[in-house]
Amino acid sequence: MNTSRLFSLLFQGSLVKRIAAGLVLGIVVALISAPLQETIGFNLAEKVGVLGTIFVKALRAVAPILIFFLVMAALANRKIGTKSNMKEIIVLYLLGTFLAAFVAVIAGFAFPTEVVLAAKEDSSSAPQAVGQVLLTLILNVVDNPLNAIFKANFIGVLAWSIGLGLALRHASDATKNVLSDFAEGVSKIVHVIISFAPFGVFGLVAETLSDKGLVALGGYVQLLAVLIGTMLFTAFVVNPILVYWKIRRNPYPLVWTCVRESGVTAFFTRSSAANIPVNIELAKRLNLDEETYSVSIPLGANINMAGAAITITILTLAAVHTLGLEVSFVSALLLSIVAALCACGASGVAGGSLLLIPLACSLFGISDDVAAQMIGVGFIIGILQDSTETALNSSTDVLFTAAVCMEEERKNAA
């Protein structure tokens, strides 16, 4: 096999297939490491585990600067003044994202899930009262921006990026272009890091299973079931309720159409941005207002992130349960609000929702090391989790757009 063929095999093609291959190879290495240890003189799984360590370290390094530039550029470049019914669509987007996070909080408490993590004892204690959580949140918000980036204070990074983004909305086009270029540059770096995800998953799975045994897979299966179950509940219960609120008739024909023609495609592309043409074509077939959907669907690909909010919430609560921390429901409700707000920063970035887990974990005093391990867990289950998340996000874009347009038609016909 020549060098170019090997490079193509390792770094090109479907990322889902390569991660699946890394997952399978990691399990195989974990199973054969113990029998081979006496023969080769070392534990093979522990040696390849360094690949997972490097991968998680790279993710932790790029996450603060990624959030800073992406959010700032998105807000600075957002056009001021839109069609009046855009407000209703944006309200649906934000309300749907929050309700998804709220449902995830309920699911996280109803089906507490633990996963196997290393160095559980390194985590700090969670605040006992919501007042302490809020105080910590405020102190993190007013942190020095450079210190926030340097120490990975994600709440401080998010606060400063939002503030600067809003302040720069009236800046010159040249300034906005520079911000967009920086955001694009950081996104490309993230893309390179994500391309190594199969190696990272390989190392993480091999080391975890070798150390903890196959019982570790049980936690992942339950975690995946809770995640996907919450997303399905949101898609087929929560979203139809919101649609009925708008159109005042049976919402399920519209819901099924959007899931079938938009969600299925998004499931395989795993990209809300790549699914925008599919959604626009579906909007045309539904005879929706072109001036509305031409703006709302691309906007939804950036701010309508119910799936990301669910992922952030469920994985954060999994870390809480794994560490045995006592967290009040009110504090968890605050988590749903934070998850809904920061989920917008996950758009257009491979694994973006996973990169925001440390931000949510910091609300409960969970150490950055444990949060980074939860990112690794997210990539292990990401073969199904990320696809389902994208399907929910993208299909909801056209669903809520159609609901508002149909409401306008109903009002005009009355």
From Swiss-Prot:
GO cellular component: plasma membrane
Compartments, as annotated in UniProt: Cell inner membrane
Catalytic activity: L-serine(in) + Na(+)(in) = L-serine(out) + Na(+)(out); L-threonine(in) + Na(+)(in) = L-threonine(out) + Na(+)(out)
Membrane association type: Multi-pass membrane protein
InterPro entries xref list: Na-dicarboxylate_symporter (IPR001991), Na:dicarbo_symporter_sf (IPR036458), Ser_Thr_transp_SstT (IPR023025)
Signal peptide range in chain numbering: none
Keyword field: Amino-acid transport, Cell inner membrane, Cell membrane, Membrane, Symport, Transmembrane, Transmembrane helix, Transport
Main location: membrane
GO biological process, one term: threonine transport
Molecular functions (GO terms): neutral L-amino acid:sodium symporter activity
Membrane-spanning ranges: 22-42, 54-74, 89-109, 148-168, 189-209, 223-243, 305-325, 337-357
Stated family: Belongs to the dicarboxylate/amino acid:cation symporter (DAACS) (TC 2.A.23) family.
PANTHER family reported for this sequence: PROTON/GLUTAMATE-ASPARTATE SYMPORTER, SERINE_THREONINE TRANSPORTER SSTT
NCBIfam families registered for this protein in UniProt: PRK13628.1 (NF010151)
Chain's role: Involved in the import of serine and threonine into the cell, with the concomitant import of sodium (symport system).
Full protein name: Serine/threonine transporter SstT
Native species: Haemophilus influenzae (strain PittEE)
Gene encoding the protein: sstT
